[in-house]
Amino acid sequence: MCGIAGQISADPNKIAANYPAYCRMQKSLARRGPDQRGMYLHGHAALIHARLAVVDLENGCQPMVLDQGGEKYILVYNGELYNAPELHAQLAALGHRFVSHSDTEVLLHAFAQWGPDCLEKLNGIFAFAVWQQRAQKLFLARDRIGVKPLFYALRGDSLIFASELKTLLCHPEIPPQVDAHGLADVLLLGPGRTPGCGVFRNVQELKPGCCAEYTVPQVGAPRLTVRRYWKLTDHEHPDDFTHTAAKVRDLVMDAVTRQLVSDVPVATFLSGGLDSSLISAIADSHFTARGKTLQTFSVGYQDNKKYFHATHFQPSPDAPYIRTMNQFLNAQHTWVALDSEALAAALLEAVDARDLPGMADVDSSLLLFCREIRKTATVALSGECADEIFGGYPWYRDKTVRERYGFPWAQSTAYRVNFFKPEVFGGIDPAAYIDEGYRATLEQTSIRPGLDPLEQRMRQMFALNFNWFMQTLLDRKDRMSMYSGLEVRVPFCDYRIAEYLYSVPWEYKDYEGHEKGLLRQAMQGVLPTEVLWRKKSPYPKTWNPAYLNAVSAMLRSAMQDPDAPLLRIAKRAALEQLLTAAETATPWYGQLMTTPQTIAWFVQLNYWLQKYRVELV
């Protein structure tokens, strides 16, 4: 994985003059790409790259250039192609000659051969930019699921793009201004974001499954066109349950196996839950067959056993199931235990990684965890997206929550709004703002005619989770891992799994009334029975009261500063009440963000406003 950035301008003098800014942009990507740096400046184009070397360590440097068919193509790319060998063979048969075995070179030749249509052939996670020097045209693309990020901004006669917001903000033409809509996204939807919203004024994120072209004509102004090249489409499911389970098994096995390819050490996350355990078991078999030992990693918290208590969302601790998996696998396992003080301190660094207030200690713990894994491995596999695709969250199966209007993971609008001064929303009605995003997603959901109300609603639930909640988790995983110089791959995000599962009837997914029952039945024999049928438990959080004390002290300290930016938008009385309130049962967001995490989120919000010098406009 890597970091990319660049600028295309109708004025070539602007490109030459902005070289110092490009150096700052490149430096801001150093954590995403600590191994190599490259830059291409010519005429109307500046392309910037920072590399984390994973495949073909010597020959995969970027920007990569190809002269072919009278055109010169320059590529910067962040991602991995999991079908690179097949594409390499196909392109070689068409006469292409390669000098490396890097997937970067495969992608470059694929674009030269097929142009934008190459996207239909790619299986992977990616965000990339190709500059066609003679045609004076930039092509941008993002993977179907949205695993890899890509932000952009139009400024006059220029388009500026980058993997991360911090990199865009290094450019002198992109000040850290946030208007009412951007602030509403942070305060009302955070840590989620409206699809395509870059929060900062006039900054957008290229949506998953989309591509864009920016052309600099000889006469007239540059033109930007954005189009969707992939979306989930409902169709009649052709298979009975037995064939469906067999197909799911094949898809999951293939997705995991493809994503184990690397020229650097590979590890897996292992929580003792279904998803990470499946990935670890498949990877372990692959490694063992080749005489290698898999590295697995688990995260926990000091004294958590002492303070843990079961909830609707977290019914059981992870440790017993991790021990079961350790005995089952041939892997070498590492336990990572985080203390409360380090977890609280890392909240600020997690904002530096995400460039926005995030998921509080759900972010900071992952950041610290990835940092430990990076000491041993450069690549890790993780279980994100299985719950969205197979229907694993409680709100899929709780009829009351499922049928309730609004985002099922964010049912606290009135509670949220009460923390903020009314004027900060600039005339935006909070409930209407949230409703707009919810309704837009339902209107765009593909539902074939003739489905019963339950099946219709489950398509909507799939789309809501896929386009909103899952994107928040993918943002988290990308930013926290890449900030640590660790590439994390997510096999359940294989687009073939999403395409196949979208139209599978709910009665199959909910096989015998079990959450993710289809996945469990499909993977019989891969895991110990007690792990295969373990009730879902989310990413672990700390229950140690020392963490609540630490984040409460941080928020109180911030509130003692009369110039604290948080106090310009939040009500002091509401914050003080939060600091003395009992822990809430209903999460602020998702499954984990109860009172300690809400306090921590306000700490992050204050730090973000201050560190990024956010100007509210």
Region spans (language model):
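Cysteine-centered catalytic environments shared across enzyme families
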Residues: M1-A353, L366, G525, E530
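Adenosyl-5′-phosphate
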Residues: M1-I4, C23-R24, K72, A93, ...
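Phosphate/ATP-binding catalytic cores across multiple sugar-kinase/actin-like superfamilies
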Residues: A246-T268, E372-T376, A380, L473, ...
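Short secondary-structure boundary/capping segments
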Residues: T311-Q314, A350-D352, P394-V401, V617
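Short acidic/histidine-rich active-site segments
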Residues: A377-D387, G391-Y393
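A mobile, often basic/glycine-rich helix-loop segment
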Residues: F390-Y415
